[in-house]
């Protein structure tokens, strides 16, 4: 359990942010730029000191009002927006800078980190010759090797171009899957959050608007996320079958089974799906004679008006709505023609090809 | 110009004294100037600007003005002399004190600029990697500011070798004790020993050229390195 509250003024900006999130998994601090995400993260590291508030991480108190543990006495790893490698040290010296100073039991070794992040070929290169993505990987490895009990990441991908970002995301997903320590990730990119985060803390103008599991936050009709044009539902499942002849994998998700293109094996692996709301259509009966592979029973929970004569329909998978939450964006006309009502059983059709399963998450 | 002039004993004594003064002054300046430069480089405030101004005063002040006040402070019946129990004026120690004050800006300013250019980030990174502030100062701040430290040391050394007004005011030019190169050149000119003046002046010209060239080369090398 991570319990945080920071309040105080910094110039014209007033911060009063409080949230309690699980002491494991990835929590994303999400919001527009200037909403105070980075300030909260800096307060969590002790780099910024606001006299009001507290911070307790899995039973260890790092701040209680004006009693603030200095950053070097906290078991915290921090990945800055820019890699900020020490230019006077080699890649390897950068990596072990924190390791040499770490106290307590060794949780992750140099060999594990270099393997996890693919740093091995970089060790002997001068920091000046590394690409942006390579530098950020070294910075993440350096933070991990300081044996943190909490890893803080401040938009680690935002300074990178598209290619470096795609190169580094799989490493982050692997971290997520293989590390026990809680991670707080600052981001203003929702797709990044949807790939990585379990818990979402939604920030607005120095305050926390809401916090909770990402799927619940996406489907909350009182939060602004539901109005986004790129609305999607994040669903986690387990691979239960592979069909190499057709290049398909079947995932068991709460309340149903979803067929996804690609080999997502091995059987039993946990995978995360992002289902865009615009790729879900609704009907009363299971379709016949259609190219759509996925037709799942679901229950309508509610409907919200969306831009452009559309309706956002909140659904729960399963015949009695016991499963994962799903979102559909359909035209107002078809919604009214079919006369859907909350509580009604429907069949949700998912365009199989639209499903994207980030490779290699879970294990 | 003959061999005899180069090996003039008085000249060698003067040269040795000058190098000793410059070395002691430079070491003291690095030891005092680096923490001072660090303090000045972190954050603002009126107090820091006032101290920074005081540090920079010797750049614009005529050396005789500085020497005059130092002479009074180090002379008989001054509070400093009462406190110490002995006079600093016309002693080697007095020269060192004067040189440290006179060359302070030439050492502090390049080091301060290097610390400012570094920004707060490297120290923050070090703190999140469990380095205490002192640890981070020695393992991150000093190595990152190395070009500034080298520039400061060279400038401080060269400036001390070349000073004239302050040492003449507080040292007087006692052979073997307070008579440095620049004062010796002045004496040679006064007594029309042009050959000897030529040797010393030419030597100082060459040294100054080498110092400035070395600084440019260091700057170029580290300058490109720092942008990594």
From Swiss-Prot, chain A:
Reactions mediated catalytically: molybdate(out) + ATP + H2O = molybdate(in) + ADP + phosphate + H(+)
All copies of domain Mop, residue ranges: 289-359
EC number from the UniProt entry: 7.3.2.5
Keywords, comma-separated and alphabetical: ATP-binding, Cell inner membrane, Cell membrane, Membrane, Molybdenum, Nucleotide-binding, Translocase, Transport
Membrane topology (UniProt): Peripheral membrane protein
InterPro entries xrefs: AAA+_ATPase, ABC_transporter-like_ATP-bd, ABC_transporter-like_CS, Mo/tungstate-bd_C_term_dom, ModC_ABC_ATP-bd, Molybdenum_import_ModC, Mop_domain, P-loop_NTPase
ABC transporter domain boundaries: 1-230
GO CC terms: plasma membrane
Compartment list: Cell inner membrane
GO-annotated molecular function: ABC-type molybdate transporter activity; ATP binding; ATP hydrolysis activity
Residues that coordinate or bind ATP: 31-38
PANTHER family to which the protein is assigned, alphabetical: ABC TRANSPORTER I FAMILY MEMBER 10, MOLYBDENUM IMPORT ATP-BINDING PROTEIN MODC 2
Similarity comment: family membership: Belongs to the ABC transporter superfamily. Molybdate importer (TC 3.A.1.8) family.
Physiological role: Part of the ABC transporter complex ModABC involved in molybdenum import. Responsible for energy coupling to the transport system.
Subunit structure: The complex is composed of two ATP-binding proteins (ModC), two transmembrane proteins (ModB) and a solute-binding protein (ModA).
Protein name: Molybdenum import ATP-binding protein ModC
Species the sequence originates in: Rhodobacter capsulatus (Rhodopseudomonas capsulata)
UniProtKB/Swiss-Prot annotation, chain B:
GO terms for cellular component: plasma membrane
Membrane topology: Multi-pass membrane protein
One family name in Pfam for this protein: BPD_transp_1
Signal peptide location: none
Protein's cellular compartments: Cell inner membrane
Transmembrane segments: 21-41, 54-74, 88-108, 133-153, 154-174, 198-218
Positions of the ABC transmembrane type-1 domain: 15-217
GO molecular function: molybdate ion transmembrane transporter activity
UniProt keyword terms in alphabetical order: Cell inner membrane, Cell membrane, Membrane, Molybdenum, Transmembrane, Transmembrane helix, Transport
InterPro entries, alphabetized: MetI-like, MetI-like_sf, ModB_ABC
Principal location class: membrane
NCBIfam families assigned to the protein according to its UniProt record, in alphabetical order: modB_ABC
Free-text function comment from the UniProt entry: Part of the binding-protein-dependent transport system for molybdenum; probably responsible for the translocation of the substrate across the membrane.
Family per similarity comment: Belongs to the binding-protein-dependent transport system permease family. CysTW subfamily.
Subunit structure comment from the entry: Homodimer.
Protein name stated in the entry: Molybdenum transport system permease protein ModB
